[in-house]
């Protein structure tokens, strides 16, 4: 499974690790992803999603239905 947030689409960022001597080596900055069971009122059940912590915070204010509609995902498949 890809390391990508299922609601926002967040994924890893390519960056540089810069040493004290200013040498640069490529490094992946991964998104902070967590498995989360979210209550889905319309389906009357829990839905298990892999979400970024930013998405979890947004989920509390917007709600699961609004975010799923924006992402274009069908919650019946989860």
UniProtKB/Swiss-Prot annotation:
Keywords: Ribonucleoprotein, Ribosomal protein
Chain's gene name: rpmB
Top-level taxon of the source organism: Bacteria
Coiled-coil parts of chain: none
Family: Belongs to the bacterial ribosomal protein bL28 family.
InterPro entries: Ribosomal_bL28, Ribosomal_bL28/bL31-like_sf, Ribosomal_bL28_bact-type, Ribosomal_bL28_sf
UniProt lineage: Bacteria, Bacillati, Cyanobacteriota, Cyanophyceae, Synechococcales
Gene Ontology terms: cellular component: ribonucleoprotein complex; ribosome
Any one GO MF annotation of this record: structural constituent of ribosome
Name the UniProt record assigns to this protein: Large ribosomal subunit protein bL28
